[in-house]
Swiss-Prot record:
This is Probable aquaporin TIP4-3. A motif (NPA 1) lies at residues 82-84. The lineage of its organism: Eukaryota, Viridiplantae, Streptophyta, Embryophyta, Tracheophyta. Aquaporins contain two tandem repeats each containing three membrane-spanning domains and a pore-forming loop with the signature motif Asn-Pro-Ala (NPA). Pfam families: MIP.
Length: 251
């Protein structure tokens, strides 16, 4: 099983690391601008995420923008756009904890800038929507929902992007985006289906609403690293291991 790598402060001056951090800031900005913007547009057009059509539109927008941004950043920073993804990959030894902290700071800044810009561009006509559990959904259930949804997301990231034995290639980011969209359809009416502390942080900052914000840190930061540990421990296989060859007729 992979071990955590602490890293070193010298990473902060490494040109490759700096490019990756700037990429995470920009990619997260663009992701949150489209994702939150789609939720604001759905609310403006009527119903928002409280209707099946609004929820489907928001889920589709998130799925598409996640797929594109992960693909765009894959060979620069990994296209994390999410502190839970970053920590989940750190749990598997794929990124140092020091670089993870730099990524998370960039992701939070990108999300904040996106939401502040959205608030300015819309002139306050539509409030920036903040993640919160639905009425009747307690904090514990919301945390559990976010943990499960984020586990699903990270499991997909490992299986389709990280695990080099899988012949997925360029389809990996698209499949990750589809999981995000499906999870929003499944969990949106209950916890909001954030799966991403940065995605929740920007709107909370722009709206000044922090009452339930902790849920969207605790749940994803449980589910993400847990998925990394499970996939690394059970599915990655020892170094140098190659899966058995398959025939076309095999299941």
């Amino acid at each position: 099983m992979a071990k955590l790598a602490l890293g070193h402060h010298r990473e902060a001056t490494d040109p490759g690391c700096l490019r990756a951090v700037v990429a995470e800031l920009l990619l997260t900005f663009l992701f949150v601008f489209s994702g939150v913007g789609s939720a604001m547009a759905a609310a403006k057009l009527g119903g928002g995420g409280d209707t099946i059509m609004g929820l489907t539109a928001v889920a589709a927008a998130h799925a598409l923008v996640v797929a594109v941004m992960v693909s765009a950043g894959l060979h620069v920073s990994g296209g994390h756009i999410n502190p839970a993804v970053t920590l989940g990959l750190a749990a598997g030894g794929h990124i140092t904890l020091f670089r993870s902290a730099l990524y998370a700071a960039a992701q939070l800044l990108g999300s904040s800038l996106a939401c502040l810009l959205l608030a300015a561009l819309t002139g306050g006509e539509e409030a920036v929507p903040v993640h919160a559990p639905a009425p009747g959904v307690g904090a514990a259930r919301a945390v559990a929902m976010e943990a499960v949804l984020t586990f699903s997301l990270l499991f997909a990231v490992y299986a389709t992007v990280v695990d080099r034995r899988r012949a997925v290639g360029a389809l990996g980011p698209l499949l990750v985006g589809l999981v995000v969209g499906a999870n929003i359809l499944a969990g949106g009416p209950y916890s909001g289906a954030s799966m991403n502390p940065a995605r929740s942080f920007g709107p909370a900052l722009a709206a000044g609403e922090w009452a339930d914000h902790w849920i969207y840190w605790v749940g994803p930061l449980i589910g993400g690293p847990l998925a990394g540990l499970v996939y690394e421990g059970l599915f990655m296989g020892p170094p140098g291991h190659e899966p058995l060859p398959r025939n076309d007729g095999d299941f």
